[in-house]
Structure formats: C-alpha cells, structure tokens
C-alpha cells in the first residue's frame, strides 16, 4: 500500500481559505471507465484538491466518487476536500452564472465549491454546440459576469472565485470594478511555457497563480510533446534519478505555483506526488530558464474576424 502524502497548501489572498498546491485534474474525453476508482485511489494517496468543469464529463462521477470516499471512510467529511469547477462559455453571461454554478453543484451532489473559475475570457451563445461555430462567439461582459461571480461567493455557493486563461490586461478589466478580487488565475504553465510576466503581475495583485498542462497535455487537442521530449529536462531527470514528469512538476511547484496534474494511472499518480522531499538546484533552474518557449493552448477556435478576438495576438494581448 502506497503511503499517504501530506500535500502543502497555500492561503488564497485575504480569504483565509487554503488550497492544496498539487491538484488532481479530471479533464478527459471520453472519461475512462475506471475514473471513480482513480479518484478513490487519489484520495488514498493524499490528493485533496480535485479540478473539474461544467464542460468536462467528470462532474457527476467526481461527485459519486466523493460520496463513495465518505462511505468508505477515506475522508471524514467533504470539508477535507478542495473542489474546483468552472463556468463554461455558454453560461458566461451575468444572468446565467448563478444557475450554472447551482447546476454544477447538483451534478456533484455538493452544497458548495471551494473555488469557481471563469473558464475562458469569451462567450458562446447559450445554444452553441461543439465544434464551435465562429458565428456563435460573443464578447464577454467582464464586469457583469464578475459581479455575478461575486454574488455566488456571497451566497455561499463557493468559498472563492477566480479566472482561467486570463491575461494581465483582461485581469485589469476585472480588477477595475471588482469588490472581491480573483483568488486564482489558472493558466497553462510548464517549463516550455513559463509565463514569467503574467506570474509577476498576479503576484503583485495578490492573485494566486495555478498551472494546468504541466507536462504539455500530451494526447489532448491542445497538447504537445515539447515538455516530455525536452532534452534539458531529460538530462536533469537522468542526473537526479527522477522521471521527466517529476522534474517538470517540481519545477512548477518550486516557482510557488500550484499545479493541476492529470493521470489516472496509479503508478504515475503516486509518482506525481513524489516531489516534496528534494529540490532542483540553482544550476538546474537556470538551465530550465533557458528553454525555448511555446504556448500550447492557443485557443484558435475562438479567433474570428467578426468576434471579439480577430487574431491570437488580440486574444492573448501579446502574451504569446
């Protein structure tokens, strides 16, 4: 039986809410048959932060796994877990935010979330389906949607609120009128896309920086193998007797950033937590610092001549 790891946490802004610095991601299409077993095994290993979204097929089975974990005594109460979900683009309108969160809670059988994020800084008409049609793309009412997110927190539907895939410029729009500051900005980050400027901005504003795709999201529509095939990381992994994945995840963690890992393989789930009792040296960090940069999650789907973002440069405000 693998040992249970105690994962360090970070306090989110002035909320007093603590979030485990390594989370368990649940995005997969279609969801594997052993997903619930994977979640239960993750809890046994020590994972307490589970990341989902209304557009993922994992909300309901995650909720079922939490119920089972309580029944089995793997956790004593739901309060031991930190659950994040996200507002999808078809619900990113001021009057649809609260109903969308309530639907996510119903899907999971939960009374509250620990964190609720705006998934992406763009909207789709409520009737939109996948694949996305360019004519369905709409600009986001940042101020109105954020006010509705604030109401979610005031109502106790979520303990904290935040954003995902937001640039510094788009965060500035939120901050200009926000009564409750975003607790989190969850974005792509790994040794091949280090996000130094955005990290500095978030740190200055008291917004916790959280990383998805720490290994490059190989096998997804937006993923690439540039992390897993990186010679610098391979050399460091060999020298330290660690896997390349451990080097990449440790690097993110060592930046003071939380990281959402994703594997339903029991061995790799355990391996991804074996990052706390060793460090990357200043020399190793310097080598990683020099790796050529590449954004994997580019969002071309939401670029349109008639939409809010006519180019990728506009979408990412030059952060590309």
UniProtKB/Swiss-Prot annotation:
SUPFAM superfamilies per UniProt: NAD(P)-linked oxidoreductase
Chain positions recorded as NADP(+) binding sites: 51, 186, 264-272
Domain of life: Eukaryota
Keywords from the UniProt entry: NADP, Oxidoreductase
GO MF annotation: an example: oxidoreductase activity, acting on the CH-OH group of donors, NAD or NADP as acceptor
Catalytic activity: 7-acetyl-epi-neemfruitin B + AH2 + H2O = (1S,3bR,4R,5aR,9aR,9bR,11aS)-1-[(4R)-5-[(2S)-3,3-dimethyloxiran-2-yl]-1,4-dihydroxybutan-2-yl]-3b,6,6,9a,11a-pentamethyl-7-oxo-1H,2H,3bH,4H,5H,5aH,6H,7H,9aH,9bH,10H,11H,11aH-cyclopenta[a]phenanthren-4-yl acetate + acetate + A + H(+)
Entry-linked InterPro entries: AKR, AKR4A/B, Aldo/ket_reductase_CS, NADP_OxRdtase_dom, NADP_OxRdtase_dom_sf
Tissue: Mainly expressed in petioles and, to a lower extent, in roots.
EC number: 1.1.1.-
Pathway stated in the Swiss-Prot or TrEMBL entry: Secondary metabolite biosynthesis; terpenoid biosynthesis
Cleaved signal peptide residues: none
List of catalytic residues: 56 (proton donor)
Protein name: 7-acetyl-epi-neemfruitin B aldo-keto reductase
Lineage: Eukaryota, Viridiplantae, Streptophyta, Embryophyta, Tracheophyta
């Amino acid at each position: 039986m693998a040992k249970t790891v105690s994962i360090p946490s970070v306090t989110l802004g002035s909320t007093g809410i603590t979030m485990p610095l390594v989370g368990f991601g649940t995005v997969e299409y279609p969801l594997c048959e052993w997903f619930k077993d994977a979640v239960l095994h993750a809890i046994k290993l020590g994972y307490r932060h589970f990341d989902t979204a209304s557009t993922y097929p994992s909300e309901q089975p995650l909720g079922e796994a939490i119920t089972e974990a309580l029944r089995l005594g793997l956790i004593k109460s739901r309060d031991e877990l930190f659950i994040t979900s996200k507002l999808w683009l078809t619900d990113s309108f001021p009057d649809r935010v609260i109903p969308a969160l309530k639907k996510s809670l119903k899907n999971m059988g939960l009374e509250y979330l620990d964190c609720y994020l705006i998934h992406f800084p763009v909207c789709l008409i409520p009737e939109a389906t996948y694949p996305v049609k360019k004519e369905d793309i709409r600009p986001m009412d940042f101020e109105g949607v954020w006010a509705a997110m604030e109401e979610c927190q005031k109502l106790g539907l979520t303990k904290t609120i935040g954003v995902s895939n937001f640039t510094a410029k788009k965060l500035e729009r939120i901050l200009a009128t926000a009564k409750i500051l975003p607790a989190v900005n969850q974005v792509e980050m790994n040794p091949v896309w280090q996000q130094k400027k955005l990290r500095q901005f978030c740190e200055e504003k008291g917004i916790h920086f959280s990383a998805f795709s720490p290994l490059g999201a190989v096998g997804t529509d937006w993923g690439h193998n540039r992390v897993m095939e990186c010679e610098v990381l391979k050399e460091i992994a060999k020298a330290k007797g660690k896997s390349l994945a451990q080097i990449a995840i440790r690097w993110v963690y060592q930046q003071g950033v939380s990281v959402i890992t994703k594997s339903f393989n029991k061995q790799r789930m355990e391996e991804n937590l074996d990052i706390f009792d060793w460090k990357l040296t200043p020399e190793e960090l310097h080598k990683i610092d020099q790796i050529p940069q590449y954004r994997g999650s580019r969002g071309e789907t939401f670029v349109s001549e008639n939409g809010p973002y006519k180019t990728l440069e506009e979408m990412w405000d030059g952060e590309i």
